[in-house]
């Protein structure tokens, strides 16, 4: 996949911008708060119709403006298409070649994007909800069917919890049965995806960190039943056994909405035994595993966004990373406050932009 051109208007603090990213490496540099991350966020939006940072839709619109727009010219599977995201008030509208997109699944494969930001490393030490969010977001990028099963499960969960809160027993059994059926489908998606990520992870970690330490990512379901033929019945029995407790606490206490991921290094929990550098390398290796999995899915590499990467990696790890993505011919956009560490890796096919107060200024390829 290749993002040939991107155009923004009234997006956050960027009033207007139009650039043609380099085929391989584009570096955007400038002080904090100038709009670098906003620009990367807009690219993620094109591929996913939602930002990678927590944000309300109106927050995406420049102060004092009524709407915002992002347009990208994308080459995927040998076909060139124009994706437009238009934001107005609290609504988002997406078109592909002037045809309205009504389902998120219709965007699938048009512009696959993997993003790494400083916030991602925090999921190593934060609670299970953060890791579930990461898992589900990355899973959706490679599996369009997942989104439907995800929404089905959480819609049923919401309805069941509503009955529990009002102590309505009528209909609860039916919703519980539906929750078990939907839950198993969700768990199977997560199990299969995590297993493949784990197969890819070790090599990526060694390439980035330059270490031979064994690393792994393992799916930890709240209820262990995904490998059984009668998994739905097993999950249903757990829900039934929890019935009285759920009524007492007015919420569904067990199930896939309590799942987690276990990150390990040297067969020990990463959050307790991994250094800060190892934790950062682990998460970045996880992102590289995502890249490979998306290539397996779509037959071509996705777009890679690296936000403030210089603050997360030392010089050796960053050199290893950039060497790896160049070998794989990945299109990469990087933001940084200090361009100096990147000057040695900039080549004739690179592009350098200075970002200041929402304005992007092209400064050549950064080579002497």
From Swiss-Prot:
Chief location of this protein within or outside the cell: cytoplasm
InterPro entries assigned to the protein according to its UniProt record, in alphabetical order: DNA-binding_RecF, DNA-binding_RecF_CS, P-loop_NTPase, RecF/RecN/SMC_N, RecF_2
Location in or out of the cell: Cytoplasm
Keywords: ATP-binding, Cytoplasm, DNA damage, DNA repair, DNA replication, DNA-binding, Nucleotide-binding, SOS response
Chain's gene name: recF
Family designation: Belongs to the RecF family.
Origin superkingdom: Bacteria
Keyword ATP-binding in annotation: yes
Pfam families per UniProt: SMC_N
Binding site for ATP: 30-37
GO BP terms, alphabetized: DNA replication; DNA synthesis involved in DNA repair; double-strand break repair; SOS response
GO CC aspect terms: cytoplasm
Protein name per its UniProtKB record: DNA replication and repair protein RecF
One of the record's GO molecular function terms: single-stranded DNA binding
